[in-house]
Amino acid sequence: MDEFHRCGKEDSFWQQCFLYPLFFQEDLYAISHDHYLDVSSSSRPMEHLSSNDQLSFLTVKRLIGQIRQQNHSIVLFVNCDPNPLADRKKSFYSESVLEALTLVLEVPFSIWSKSSVEGMNECKSFRSIHSIFPFLEDKFPHSNSILDARIPYSIHPEILVRTFRRWIRDAPSLHPLRSVLYDYRNSPENLQRSIIVVPRVNTRFFLFLLNYYVCECESILFSRLKRSSHSRSLTHGSFPQRTHFHRKIKHIIIFSRRNSLKTIWSLKDPKIHYVRYGERPIIAIKGAHLLVKKCRYYLLIFRQFYFHLWSEPYRVCSHQLSKNCSSSPGYFLRVRMNPIFVRTKMLDELFIADLITNEMDPIVPIVPIIGLLATEKFCDISGRPISKLSWTSLTDDDILDRFDQIWRNLFHYYSGSFDRDGLYRIKYILSLSCAKTLACKHKSTIRVVRKELGPELFKKSFSKEREFDSLPFSSKAAARSQRERIWHSDIPQINPLANSWQKIQDLKIENLFDQ
């Protein structure tokens, strides 16, 4: 596969026209077979791995020949499984062939994505100690409205196959993809017409399908937004499984005065900003309310025209950007804008300019966070910690790891806030709730748990030194972070609190449109 990648980089003819012969490569199915056994062996005991888990390459060739018939009324791979009554998702042949199909389709997509990233000089992503707050500081104060557009995952199989034809000219290589998509649509779990892209199905094929679908939506949308925007540039960024960060981009215009030899620099703010975290795209717009309505209408028409699907109106909702609060990556942030008065004086005393700018001071929203903790049964509505009864069946290490993960995510997100008193109040609630959960599990008291498990138990998970262990700072930087506002975001996945908050917001939006 690596050799084919190198050949594809040298000659685009290979990457677009000769994918179908790869389906008859025995090495390809050997790779997918080994990968399937590795995944299945990690999820089930060794005694469940039968001797029937062996791939017959002759059967695979016959399967590919039958795919050319395109009989979508027959469920694919059922006749090949040693146990026809087994679930199709757990079928050995379906998983192996699906893995091979994903490997073949990833070849042109990976080559195209690498070439597009290498050629994109306007905006490059990189890891930083700063979180999404630079985006909020630089972009949101210059915008007055935001569009929260959830990506629709309901799409017809044929439309999805036709989008692949834009990048893959080898038509026979798309026959297996078409058969798999129709097979999934006709399965007993999905007796609907167009439910295909499922973001929560943790398989390689559907993750690749989701990434391609989102990339296709954004690539077309960016080109249209750049044409419709009055600004020459459109800043955008994506925050998938891990949080990636983008450099602060400032568009500078240079002009000079005839009567002065000095050069004056002024900033030109783009009018449309796009950021996506997972499946939640956010578009920040600067303009009148009519422009916001046009953008919302354009997004709905765009999805209907290019993907032939109807999006519910609540999936693209517009909000007036508040000056004291904002929400991003599933978290809630309260902001205090402090005006700063700056006076500038030129050396030759030609003129004196007074500038008034706003400084964004984030504040920990203690009341909404306590409300979320109460919803997840970590405390009551007044903020008094209680035991998490649903976690008492777990081991002590699992309980500590879950509480520690929630605390570290919240600390990394809100550590740059102006006032940390509310943040350490959240730490007190989580640590005491963890102690009560362990005491409830062992049917004892908090004092007995501390005495039996040791005083170092909670210091390991909730210690103040642990907060800076994962920060890429030196000891001086760690000490300086005590008094300076430094953000560090290392959130591989959204914790249950953020998911709970997002569900509450979705219900509010749906109820608003139902009325």
From Swiss-Prot:
Membrane-spanning parts: none
GO molecular function, one term: RNA binding
Function recorded in the entry: Usually encoded in the trnK tRNA gene intron. Probably assists in splicing its own and other chloroplast group II introns.
GO cellular component terms, semicolon-separated: chloroplast
Localisation: Plastid, Chloroplast
Similarity comment: family membership: Belongs to the intron maturase 2 family. MatK subfamily.
Main location: plastid
GO biological process: mRNA processing; RNA splicing; tRNA processing
Keywords, ordered alphabetically: Chloroplast, mRNA processing, Plastid, RNA-binding, tRNA processing
Domain of life: Eukaryota
Name of the protein in its database record: Maturase K
InterPro entries membership: Domain_X (IPR024937), Maturase_MatK (IPR002866), Maturase_MatK_N (IPR024942)
